[in-house]
């Protein structure tokens, strides 16, 4: 049996080869680390259940950095989103927030500092082990998630099974599974 390749495919492959595009490196311009973190932050809220079936609407950040600017950029392009970005003067003045993102310099004393129903997220090493809920961890040029399900449960939050399948989970005992 003989396989036939459509003429359109042959012409396309020939055009790519002749123009030199086929010889270009496979790597395309990618996303920056702040853009990836911003995408995680804006999509993370869809995989977490808040107390009383409320829908998360507010992302609070402790400083205006590259990740904050990327979150703002994502939110400004989404027509269907009702998400709001609030840049805090300090963590002591926490307005009603559904998600609080902290950079690695501002995570000290996270345990018990925040209100029930606030998802805490940071990129500091050991954040989830210290009582934070979601930690961004850099692993081999990728951003991995570490989730402390015990801290989430104490705050009345529940991560979806789809989110947990993508993450390293730290239960209440503090050991990874």
Enumerate the language-model features and the residues they cover.
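Short hydrophobic alpha-helices and adjacent helix-cap/hinge residues
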Residues: 2-8, 12, 20-177
């Amino acid at each position: 049996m003989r396989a036939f390749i459509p003429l359109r495919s042959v012409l396309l492959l020939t055009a790519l080869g002749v123009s030199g595009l086929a010889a270009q490196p496979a790597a395309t311009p990618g996303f920056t680390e702040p853009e990836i973190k911003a995408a995680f932050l804006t999509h993370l809220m869809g995989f977490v259940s808040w107390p009383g079936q409320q829908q998360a609407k507010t992302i609070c950040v402790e400083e205006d950095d590259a990740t904050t600017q990327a979150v703002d950029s994502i939110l400004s392009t989404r027509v269907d989103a009702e998400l709001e970005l609030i840049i805090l003067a300090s963590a002591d003045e926490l307005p009603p927030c559904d998600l609080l993102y902290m950079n690695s310099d501002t995570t000290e004393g996270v345990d018990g500092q925040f209100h029930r129903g606030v998802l805490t997220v940071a990129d500091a090493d050991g954040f989830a082990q210290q009582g934070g809920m979601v930690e961004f961890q850099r692993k081999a040029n990728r951003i991995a998630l570490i989730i402390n399900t015990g801290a989430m449960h104490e705050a009345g939050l529940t991560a979806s099974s789809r989110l947990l399948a993508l993450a390293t989970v730290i239960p209440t005992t503090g050991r990874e599974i």
